[in-house]
């Protein structure tokens, strides 16, 4: 399948083996959940928490152990981001590109990139409002510079 804003194809990669609980993990489920909650409370994003669990604690994937994704587990513990992580990273990217375009007004390729990022953000906001992740009154202009 082609990518969203280009005609190029994605690259193939290895697939994760699902349904096999890793037996080499040295931590119990409660310990893994407590570590994840502590890391999230320290200000890390969910993806960084997953990377930290993988690299430092030897937990290959939370879903294989719990049967649920990390965000769902953290939401059950009452720890939830008000803006989803993918939308938040797009907002940061948009702000950086917008600042660059202000300083370099003749950079037309980045103006187009800024417009593509905005289109992707609007699409995500529409999806999150429809699924109930974001409030219906939430507005994207509040978080943009």
Swiss-Prot record:
Domain of life: Archaea
Molecular functions per Gene Ontology: small ribosomal subunit rRNA binding; structural constituent of ribosome
Gene Ontology CC: one annotated term: cytosolic small ribosomal subunit
SMART domains: Ribosomal_S13_N, Ribosomal_S15
Listed transmembrane segments: none
Any one Gene Ontology BP term: translation
Keywords, comma-separated and alphabetical: Ribonucleoprotein, Ribosomal protein
SUPFAM superfamilies to which the protein is assigned, alphabetical: S15/NS1 RNA-binding domain
A Pfam family reported for this protein in Swiss-Prot or TrEMBL: Ribosomal_S13_N
Keyword Ribonucleoprotein: yes
Assembly behavior: Part of the 30S ribosomal subunit.
Entry's family note: Belongs to the universal ribosomal protein uS15 family.
HAMAP family assigned: Ribosomal_uS15_A
Protein name in the entry: Small ribosomal subunit protein uS15
Gene (name only): rps15
């Amino acid at each position: 399948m082609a990518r969203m804003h280009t005609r190029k194809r994605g690259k193939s990669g290895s697939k994760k083996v699902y349904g096999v609980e890793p037996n080499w993990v040295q931590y119990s489920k409660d310990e893994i959940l407590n570590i994840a909650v502590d890391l999230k409370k320290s200000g890390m994003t969910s993806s960084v928490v997953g990377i930290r669990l993988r690299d430092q604690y030897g937990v290959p994937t939370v879903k294989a152990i719990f049967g649920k994704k990390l965000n769902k587990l953290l939401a059950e513990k009452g720890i939830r981001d008000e803006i989803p992580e993918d939308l938040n990273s797009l907002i940061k990217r948009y702000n950086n590109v917008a600042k660059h375009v202000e300083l370099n007004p003749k950079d037309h390729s980045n103006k187009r990139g800024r417009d593509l990022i905005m289109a992707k953000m609007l699409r995500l906001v529409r999806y999150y409002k429809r699924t109930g992740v974001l409030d219906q009154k939430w507005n994207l202009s509040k978080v943009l510079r």
